[in-house]
Swiss-Prot record:
UniProt-recorded name of the protein: CMRF35-like molecule 7
Disulfide bonds: 36-104
GO terms assigned for molecular function: identical protein binding; transmembrane signaling receptor activity
Binding partners and assembly: Interacts with TYROBP, which enhances cell surface expression and activation properties. Interacts with GRB2 in the presence of FYN.
Organs and tissues of expression: Expressed exclusively in myeloid lineages.
SUPFAM superfamilies: Immunoglobulin (SSF48726)
The Ig-like V-type domain, residue ranges: 18-120
Species in which this protein is naturally found: Homo sapiens
Protein function: Acts as an activating immune receptor through its interaction with ITAM-bearing adapter TYROBP, and also independently by recruitment of GRB2.
Amino acid sequence: MWLPPALLLLSLSGCFSIQGPESVRAPEQGSLTVQCHYKQGWETYIKWWCRGVRWDTCKILIETRGSEQGEKSDRVSIKDNQKDRTFTVTMEGLRRDDADVYWCGIERRGPDLGTQVKVIVDPEGAASTTASSPTNSNMAVFIGSHKRNHYMLLVFVKVPILLILVTAILWLKGSQRVPEEPGEQPIYMNFSEPLTKDMAT
């Protein structure tokens, strides 16, 4: 099915609207903070934090209410700074089994937005390093409200559609060439009559 360029670009641009650190690490019994940044326009949307390698089965641990009011559940808290377009997730009293893959996400009508964050918990007494800088290398699109399909949807569906769209545009431009103006028709003179007269004389 052919999609209008505006709709296609809107769909593809969604996966670049949020980014966070590729990984964070902290010591056992300590705490860690994850900051996820989003683009303008998503300030009043619900932000969430879920756990699990696969997002179609990941468990939502906490989420905002679309405001800047902080929320806390057990050892996890979340707060959205809409002015800076950053929401912060804090995990306290870390245990070894807290090490896992997590997701920063924004709930919206249609595909949710999100980015993967790997949490590493070092054994007690081990040295820890700071969180890596934000990256968009692991961005993905989530399908549904917390019911998300695999990110390969982006690679195998949307990218080919974009390529088909570009090919169609190039083909249309090639087929809509400006027709050349008709040239002047050559003038033919009838020399048969004078030639006949000359031969008769």
